[in-house]
């Protein structure tokens, strides 16, 4: 079990070898250190987003990969819809919270779509805060953004990283059928740790139901989910979570290291090694059968490293269906 002392976990790739997880309370291990974000492309995206009054999860959630993602040849960002204030208070998340956030910007879907079209990216991730104060949880706002973007630039591939819409399956289906290419919703952690990690209004079975219903709502839709490691989960619990997600029809599974954003958030129980993340990638693809697993200390559910593979996968699927 991962905990406040050094933990030894079996390396499934070789007989008898082990991988040691680092105990918490130490300096951040070298594989988690990133340079401060800067650069011409970074500045361009930052100014573009600010000028259009768009929010990104890259900034709001203090993502460690923002410098890398924003400084690529084309640069990519995960745009956060429906404002920057969430109606829930998960204990791992740095996004602002309030039970009465400001109303959504009605111009946001069009502004977002036009901005993305101008960036010239081939793959974009749209996400949002939870908006339990809106009857449909923001599903139509999300869907309108997707529809507008596809109208302006049909070639762009769109991933939507969604809330659970309070279990409203009509809202799930509405977004799933909006024209997006990947429907992502995160279970966040293993089943045992759900109540400790997530807001009480979220739960494991509801998240699995959302993923299952999205998959059933549109033929050919790719589904995706993610969990954080380093919160005290056990290996067998991770395997069980993978199996449950696969049974719910999930195609893509990602795993990354939990990092405590502020002292008020949950502490890190363990820094999981890169070698262990490599094991989970192999296990997920070769044993569980996911089409793709992104697994690494700095991998996040919307991290660009996986997008190159996913983009190729989606375009191949389209060719197989006879689409252009």
Swiss-Prot record:
> Which UniProt keyword terms apply here?
4Fe-4S, Chloroplast, Iron, Iron-sulfur, Metal-binding, Plastid, S-adenosyl-L-methionine, Transferase
Q: According to its record, what are the GO cellular component terms?
A: chloroplast; mitochondrion
Where is it mostly found? plastid
GO terms of molecular function: 4 iron, 4 sulfur cluster binding; lipoate synthase activity; metal ion binding
Q: Where is the Radical SAM core domain?
A: 72-291
Q: Where in the cell is it found?
A: Plastid, Chloroplast
Disulfide-bonded cysteine pairs: these are: none
* Recorded metabolic or biological pathway in which this protein acts: Protein modification; protein lipoylation via endogenous pathway; protein N(6)-(lipoyl)lysine from octanoyl-[acyl-carrier-protein]: step 2/2
Which stretches of sequence are listed as region Disordered? 1-30
Homology family: Belongs to the radical SAM superfamily. Lipoyl synthase family.
Q: Which NCBIfam families is this protein grouped with?
A: lipA, PRK05481.1, PRK12928.1
- What is the protein's given name? Lipoyl synthase, chloroplastic
Source organism phylogeny: Eukaryota, Viridiplantae, Chlorophyta, Mamiellophyceae, Mamiellales
